[in-house]
Amino acid sequence: HTRSLSVSWLGDVYKRQVVVLGIYYKLQTFLYLPANGIVQGMRPLIGYNYGAKQHARVKKLYELTLIMSAAIMAAGTVICLFASRPLMQLFTSNPETVAIGQTALRIICLGFVVSAVSTTSSGALEGLGKGAESLVISLCRYIVFIMPLAAVLCHFLGANGVWHAFWITEVLSAIVAYPVYRKAVGKR
């Protein structure tokens, strides 16, 4: 799991950052939940329309889901940018941890909107019965990009490098996800 691997990179030196990472993952669950729900709802619809050879509907469903997910994630970005302190204070009263968490949320949330591309593409591929292609996107998000980026950026930026690894991973994953989706949909 990404969280366990990220924590191992931070180790004992960054105990407060490890706490912040745990808090972020709790918040992430709530921030991504509405977008993930929309993606879950798209899966059977896109699969049905693909099977019925209604390719224009497949495209429309993908685009609509992408727009709705991006809008939800834009709201999440705004919340994290402007309410990072109260969000952190839901979990801790330690001022140092809150300060570190504010920085983390403000950096990580920069990738929220673009994450809609990989989550929508991955969900659409699953709905189309193309699990291998969906797995490629998931592996990019959770292992291929984030772990090396976190290790390298942590070396140069300290714990903030881990936070930057999140949004950079989302950008790189989106760059991979959309062409993987397009190629898979092109195979009829």
Per-region residue spans from a language model:
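Alpha-helical membrane-protein architecture signal
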Residues: 6, 20-23, 97-98, 136
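Single conserved hydrophobic/aromatic residue that forms the stacking wall/gate
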Residues: 1-14
